[in-house]
Structure formats: C-alpha cells, structure tokens
Amino acid sequence: MKKYNVCIVGGGSTYTLGFLKSFARMQEEFPLNKLVLFDIDGERQKPIGQYGDIMFSERYPELDFSYTTDPAEAYQDMDFIFMQMREHIPLAHGKIGQETCGAGGMAYGLRSCVDMIEAIHQIRQYSPEAWILNYSNPAAIVAEALRREFPDDKKILNICDQPENVVRSTSRLLGYDWEDLDPVYFGLNHYGWFTHIYDKNTGELMWGMI
C-alpha cells in the first residue's frame, strides 16, 4: 500500500493533537511516509510538535515527522493537506465569538478567506496534485470563496461534521440509532435546520425527532 505525505496547516492548534493520535492509530489503514506540521506561530506550534516527537517515537518510529514555519518546506510534494485556520476578532471587542454566523462569522470569514486563498496558491506551487481537506470555519463561506477562486481545482474538499454530531447526540437522547436516520439539513454548518428526518428503513417521517 502506498504511504502518503501529509501536511497539517495550523499545526499549533490544540485540535492537531487529535489528528496526531488518529494517524498513529490508523497507520495500517492510512499509512504515512511523512507528516509535517506548519504554523506561522512557531512558539505556539512547538509544544504540539514536541508531543508528536515523543508519541511517534514510541508508536510510529518509521514515520518522518517534523514541524516548521517555512511554507516551502511544509508544502513540498504532499499528497494530502489539512487546513485549520482560526482568527479571533469579536471576542476582543466583547461580542459573540461564534465562528460561522453573525458578526463573528462574517468577520471570521473575511479574514479566513484571504488567508486560505493565499495558502492554497502557495500549496499548488509545491504540491499541485495534493488533496486539500479544508475544515476552516466558517466552512460554507470559505468553501464558496475557494470555489470562486479555484473553479477548476477538484481536489479541494470542504468539511464540517457539525450536522452529523447534532444528529448523533439528539438521536442518542431520544433513544434512536442515528444510523437508522435519513436527515435533510439546510443552512450554514453551525446555523441550520433539519427540515425533515426520515426512517431509513421505512421512509416515514420521524415525528418523534421533530
């Protein structure tokens, strides 16, 4: 099986720890040759990188793991690039800091879109065929900006698991198996509605979930 080269942009995020553990756990299903963390804030990224050094030396010693603040080093010859950028504006002004809707979402989107577009232009210089998995919020706004800027790039995937998480938690509270549900979701990723929820087995509308 091919071993992949992967870069995580925003390596200083605490969410990166979950990715590192997942890569170590799934090395048989998704084997890696190289894993690089990239962040513009080297000090913030350093403890995450040190954690990776220790964990991979014990659980994945053959992995080529590193962390850097140099985009040329981070983006070179990658197969997959995970994007996780976060900007902070509203909280500094005493406003709601929700990152996908309202004033926070709009401000976040205006900043994230610019940085995302710049990052992807850089990535394509070094890894033109890499799959880019973006989960920077506000996901819907960033996805639309990337679609307009890179209309022919079919290897940019925009991901959010919030709707699925809502279905999982709600079904558990109400005593249903979420895998038996067929939901219809409308709206932004953190600001939407389930207009219908059907039973996959019968096709009937599940009034108990509404």
PLM feature segments, named:
Residues F38-R44, E62-E129, N134:
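Rossmann-like NAD(P)-binding element
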Residues R25-E28, D53-E58, Q125, E144-I156, ...:
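Short, surface-exposed basic-aromatic patches at helix termini and helix-loop junctions that form
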Residues N5-L35:
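N-terminal Rossmann-like dinucleotide-binding module
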Residues D152-K155, I159-I210:
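Substrate/ligand-engaging "lid" and interaction regions
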Residues F30-D53:
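NAD(P)-binding Rossmann-fold cofactor-contacting core
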Residues K2-Y4, V9-G12, R44-Q45, V142-L157:
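Conserved N-terminal glycine/acidic-rich loop preference
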Residues G12-Y15, G42-E43, W131-V142, Q162-E164:
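Gly/Ser/Thr-rich loops at beta-strand to alpha-helix junctions
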Residues F82-M83, I132-S136, L157-I159, Y185:
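A structural signal for short, well-ordered beta-strand segments and their strand-loop junctions
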